[in-house]
Amino acid sequence: MRGYLLIAAASLAFAQEATIKVDVDVVSVYASVRDKRGAYIKDLTKDDFTVMEDGKKQEIRYFSRESDLPLTIGLLIDVSRSQEGLIEVEKRAGAQFFQQVLRPKDAAFVISFGSEAELLQDLTNSQRLLAKGLEGLRLNASVGGLHPSPTGAKQRGTIMYDAVYLAAAEKLKDEVGRKVIVLITDGMDFGSRVSLQEAITSAHKSDAIIYSVYYVDPRVYGWGGYSDSDLKKMSEETGGRVFRVDRKNDLEDIFRQIQEEVRSQYAIGYNPAGQSSGGGFRKIEIKTSNKELKVLARKGYYANKN
């Protein structure tokens, strides 16, 4: 059954002051490691990693090369007018992605966003329900949703930041295990009630990794489009990265790459040492003993005040 993300404007305006409690006795970080050619390195040990928090070395207490923790995926799809010609491809590729990546104890949900955000399918492990949700993709969300507009009013644009904020704060914050947002868009935001930084903060507080898929319709833009700078910031801050659909990589290829990455992560846990009891954002840096390897992991987390 289709549902809507009905969040009052006042609650979104309050986003900067909202607090999501995080137990910082154990900080969990999921990291993927690639070599210069981009191949994933899957045979490292705990001793190959160094974890720094705010410049202080931390002792790794928990480590796993093959994380069997549940995986929760939010698939967020831009259905603004510039993306109209891509919707049918996204339906097919999205359904195939869920079939490939989801295991029995995993779950996923689907949100479309244009002038408003619409929850097409809530958290489920059912391939049938997820496929049905994807079939609900359509140009803009013109009824209900986050930003209802009176008859005759202009469309508000593409509320990309709001969609990310809501996916993290409303759907992922209470889930356990690994949490991933896959964001398919041309990278433009127009009309969101929250800022780019508020969307990133929401992802941090929910421990969500953002993988952005920069997808533009060549019939609209050629092979140009808007800048992907916002997508890079969201993804890199949370431990993900940006993929570009182009002549060499179609959407199905990129979904396969995302699947490989989330299944190639190391789970690293530590108890923060050498920190004051104050809250706020704490920076994390993860390195390997081999300087030629690239580590992809979130940049930090928000700690509670004791």
Model-derived features: where do they sit?
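Scaffold/interface architecture of coatomer-like assemblies
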Residues: 14-306
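C-terminal end-of-chain detector
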Residues: 2-3, 306
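Sec-dependent N-terminal signal peptides
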Residues: 3-13
